[in-house]
UniProtKB/Swiss-Prot annotation:
Organism encoding this protein: Macaca fascicularis
GO process terms (BP): maintenance of protein location in nucleus; positive regulation of tyrosine phosphorylation of STAT protein
UniProt KW keywords: Cell projection, Cilium, Cytoplasm, Cytoskeleton, Mitochondrion, Nucleus
The organism's place on the tree of life at top rank: Eukaryota
Listed name of the protein: ADP-ribosylation factor-like protein 2-binding protein
């Protein structure tokens, strides 16, 4: 095989594996955005969010929760992917993901990171707890409403007549 044939073969192999990777990521997006997955994850977080505290110390109780989450969510996602891609191999995909992590949308990668990175998992729970307790990110102080009318003397009733 000469150099040109090798390059062509490598390109077609690369393109096929890239297309396969892109297809899996597309399916992952569909699965993660699906109401069934959202409900599964929300129910799990509702069950355990009060266990998590925003401290440097990680409680021993976090470990079984983390393991249960991995088992539940990873199993669900793998089953969904197997329905869409017969013969799908999660371990092989995870390896490929490490090489393509810059190409994956942030929210997808962050969610996948919760399977392997305990701190990402804990942060997800802390964010959820803050949201449940009304301590979520408040952007209202940064919002300013400005009238688009040139004259501020136009009354509300006159303004309504214009629309």
């Amino acid at each position: 095989m000469d150099a040109l044939e090798e390059e062509s073969f490598a390109l077609s192999f690369s393109s096929a594996s890239d297309a396969e990777f892109d297809a899996v990521v597309g399916y992952l997006e569909d699965i993660i955005m699906d109401d069934e997955f959202q409900l599964l994850q929300r129910n799990f977080m509702d069950k355990y969010y009060l266990e998590f505290e925003d401290t440097e110390e990680n409680k021993l109780t976090y470990t079984p929760i983390f393991n249960e989450y991995i088992s539940l969510v990873e199993k669900y996602i793998e089953e969904q992917l197997l329905q869409r891609i017969p013969g799908f191999n999660m371990a092989a995909f995870t390896t490929t993901l490490q090489h393509h992590k810059d190409e994956v949308a942030g929210d997808i990668f962050d969610m996948l990171l919760t399977f392997t990175d305990f701190l990402a998992f804990k942060e997800m729970f802390l964010d959820y707890r803050a949201e449940k307790e009304g301590r979520g990110l408040d952007l209202s102080s940064g919002l300013v409403v400005t009238s688009l009318c040139k004259s501020s003397s136009v009354s509300a009733s006159q303004n309504n007549l214009r629309h």
